[in-house]
A protein has these predicted regions:
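Immediate flanking context of iron-sulfur cluster ligation sites
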Residues: 2-20, 55-97, 114
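Short runs of predominantly hydrophobic/aromatic residues within well-ordered alpha helices
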Residues: 17, 21, 161, 165, ...
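General secretory precursor processing signal
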Residues: 18, 23, 27-28, 79, ...
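Hydrophobic, aromatic-lined core segments that form the binding pocket/scaffold
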Residues: 175-363
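Internal, well-ordered alpha/beta segment that forms a basic, Gly-enriched binding/recognition surface
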Residues: 83, 90-183
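Short glycine-rich, low-complexity/disordered patches
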Residues: 51-67, 180-185, 326-329
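Long, low-complexity, compositionally biased intrinsically disordered regions
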Residues: 2-22, 111, 124-126, 130, ...
Length: 363
């Protein structure tokens, strides 16, 4: 019998449906899984005809999956004027495509279990993620449907990474200024990468290896330099952008970088009572992305992704504060979900951010 691990807030999630300002049926190409597609072929009547006409078939040449055709306004054709799903209304929730049932939930499978989470791109999920206080808490349950399929070696390697991630969680939530915390996380990640490499490739240690500049450099000082932030924002602006509000946010921040850097400490002092939100974001990004190191052995890069992601959101918070005089709770949710929507659901984007070398920008 395997396990399922979930953040403690997971069970509190409820889709807010038509009250959502960022409907997940608008602006996203929604794939239709094979089981749902087979069922939709059997639906009778006018609705069945309209349902099938709304689906673009899979294309073997391009590798594109079957998906709902978006209309001219990039809405799912089965989203009615009240922003309610007609599949749900006509056929029931259990007949929705798998991705529609799951979103914003995501799943990561391991040799003897599974981890579930909620994506930050959803405003209802972002509300829960930002609201947490204290150390991260998780619910772990045994599950009949999750079998133990891995070898002993695979499980051992996973447990090493789980232990490393637990140490990072602790650092992310300790009572310390954000920059000090980021520097500790970066140094810890560098040490963890070396430990992980030694585990995979147990060559004799070079006792004469000198300490490098990177070992003693401050990640935060390097990140909050104008040259680093300019390079980073240019990278983000070069990604495929889904919605214009994201481009507007990035270009606005880029135009005011000197002021953002100069006033950042004032912002952090003014919003000291919400410092835990950045702890929660660090924890969220570590939980969601760190264990992907099983696939590429890039432990340090996964921590880099969490650091850059959280710091970019903070950068945009400072810009919002300068532009509007405050960062409302709703504005914070909007910034978080925009970042997640634009970055986390494109593997090329996350890989490039994970590989973005902050310390190299100092050279």
């Amino acid at each position: 019998m395997g396990y399922i691990r979930r953040p403690a807030y997971y069970k509190a999630f409820r889709c807010i449906g038509s009250d959502c300002t960022e409907n997940c049926c608008i602006g996203w190409e929604i794939d239709v899984d094979e089981d749902s597609l087979a069922y939709y072929e059997t639906v009778p009547g006018d609705f069945g005809e309209r349902l099938r006409a709304s689906i673009a078939p899979a294309d073997a040449q391009t590798g594109e999956s079957a998906h709902f055709r978006l209309d001219a306004e990039e809405r799912c054709p089965l989203l009615n004027d009240c922003n309610l799903c007609e599949v749900l209304l006509h056929l029931g929730e259990d007949k929705m495509a798998q991705i529609c049932t799951d979103h914003p939930r995501y799943y990561e499978w391991f040799s003897d279990g599974r981890e579930d989470g909620l994506g930050l791109c959803c405003e209802a999920a972002a509300e829960l993620i930002l609201a947490q206080t204290g150390a991260p808490a998780f619910d772990v349950t045994e599950a009949d449907g999750v079998s133990e399929t891995g070898t002993e070696a695979e499980t051992e390697l996973e447990n090493v990474l789980f232990s490393m991630r637990d140490a990072l969680f602790w650092l992310a939530c300790e009572d310390a200024p954000f920059d000090d915390k980021a520097d500790r996380l970066y140094r810890t990640a560098k040490a963890q990468q070396e430990q992980y490499d030694d585990l995979l490739f147990p060559f004799p240690e070079d006792e004469d290896a000198d300490e490098t500049d990177e070992d003693t450099a401050s990640w935060s000082q390097a990140f909050w330099r104008e040259s680093t932030l300019t390079s980073l924002l240019e990278l983000l602006l070069g990604f495929e952008i889904n919605k214009d509000d994201w481009r507007t946010l990035l270009t606005g921040a880029k135009a005011r970088l000197p002021e953002i850097i100069a006033r950042r400490n004032d912002f952090l002092q003014a919003y000291q009572g919400k410092r835990h939100e950045y702890d929660n974001l660090l924890t969220y990004f570590l939980y969601r992305h760190f264990m992907k190191a099983l696939g590429d052995d890039a432990v340090q890069d996964k921590v880099q992704l969490a650091l850059v992601s959280t710091a970019v959101i903070q950068l945009l918070d400072v810009y919002e504060w300068l532009a509007k005089g405050e960062v409302t709770h709703w504005a914070q949710i909007c910034i978080c979900k925009a970042y997640s929507r634009e970055i986390e659901y494109n593997e090329d984007n996350t890989e490039q951010l994970a590989a973005f070398s902050v310390l190299d920008e100092m050279e």
